[in-house]
Amino acid sequence: MTNKGQLLQDPFLNALRKEHVPVSIYLVNGIKLQGHIESFDQYVVLLRNTVTQMVYKHAISTVVPARAVNLSLESEAE
């Protein structure tokens, strides 16, 4: 994924991680996973509940936070 593609993704996932926001992650096959984002990189998200699961980003359809998240995007206009 290019840097432009991650201008929203990385700050969003990082805010969820830093603020320990509970999330529901829906996979492309319809399965719902719940937990807290522990870490992430270009390809995977580590989701923690009773255990830590490594979820591949290409399998994720939607990430739904349990509450609103404040994003601070420094370089919005490019």
UniProtKB/Swiss-Prot annotation:
GO terms for cellular component: cytosol. The keyword RNA-binding applies. The lineage of its organism: Bacteria, Pseudomonadati, Pseudomonadota, Betaproteobacteria, Burkholderiales. HAMAP family: Hfq. It comes from Janthinobacterium sp. (strain Marseille) (Minibacterium massiliensis). It holds the Pfam family Hfq. Coiled coil: none annotated. It comes from the Bacteria. RNA chaperone that binds small regulatory RNA (sRNAs) and mRNAs to facilitate mRNA translational regulation in response to envelope stress, environmental stress and changes in metabolite concentrations. Also binds with high specificity to tRNAs. Belongs to the Hfq family. CDD domains: Hfq. InterPro entries: Hfq (IPR005001), LSM_dom_sf (IPR010920), Sm (IPR047575). This is RNA-binding protein Hfq.
